[in-house]
Amino acid sequence: MIRQDQLRYLSQQSKVSVLIIGAGINGIAAFRDLALQNVDVLMVDKGDFCSGTSSASSHMIHGGIRYLENGELRLVREAVQERNRLLQLAPHYVKPLPTMIPIFNWQSGIWKIAAKFFGLSGLLLSPTGLRLAQSKGEGHQRGGVIVKLGLMLYELWNSPSIVTAARMPSHRFQLKVSSLKQFPELSSDIVATAIYYDAVVLSPERLAVELVTETEKMSQNATAINYLSVVGMADSQRTVILHDEVSGQQFQIQPELVINATGPWIDLTNRKLGQPTDFIGGSKGSHLVLDHPKL
């Protein structure tokens, strides 16, 4: 439906079962799930679809391998399976990504990782009962034994019975000579390298927009409109006021349920809705983009 037609319909039909505020990947996922269950749903965003946090990601679709150290097996399993589903369902956007781990020794981190895995990181005792001493930098290294065990465990859920068409290649180890021959820029201090596969999404915003347009085609009860921001609540406290950033027109919507999917703006949105919260802390993630042809 053309945007002007959507706005015209919105001015005539103010009631909707679910209003989703925020069209990042979480808002879009909720939008799609509700629409496929034949729920009438309206999703709005103050800017372009997927223009916030969802577009400013590392573009990785990874299985959460680092969570193995904490023993979060259920989380890793879910992440690997969802990664494989994306590889199968969106191969035009999601591709396998070979990832190389340089290994500088074979034994570092065995007891530390084992203690962390079993929730005993406060003890860190060796079998002899002596507290383990760490050499300089050892706390940040994972030896070859740990990397091998971790990758084997990681691939337990990469079974063809889960997503046959999207099974990833198995990991492999290369010793020092072969590694330096293939990657001569690596430090000569390595003893080996490990190569495993995760996935990368080349254009997360395109994948998101495709999900929106396909959902609207599949369900007549699903409407998604961008450049429509939340102003506040009407006096009735059951009516949400929306503002068209293009024309300046305002709309009053009466949803039975509101889903706030505005990510880091969630507290600001809740304040406008008359429900002040303080969910967002002061953490921030940063990504470095390097222009390096060899990478």
Predicted regions and their residues:
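Central beta-strand plus flanking loop segment that forms part of the substrate or channel wall
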Residues: 277-295
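Extreme N-terminal leader/targeting segments of oxidoreductases
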Residues: 1-18, 33-37
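Dinucleotide-binding Rossmann-like beta1-alpha1 core, especially the glycine-rich loop
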Residues: 59-178
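Flavin (primarily FAD) binding-site architecture
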Residues: 260-275
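Core beta-strand elements of the Rossmann-like FAD/NAD(P) dinucleotide-binding domain
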Residues: 14-16, 247-257
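A conserved short coil-to-beta-strand element within the FAD-binding core of flavoproteins
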Residues: 225-239
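Short hydrophobic core segments
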Residues: 20-21, 253-263
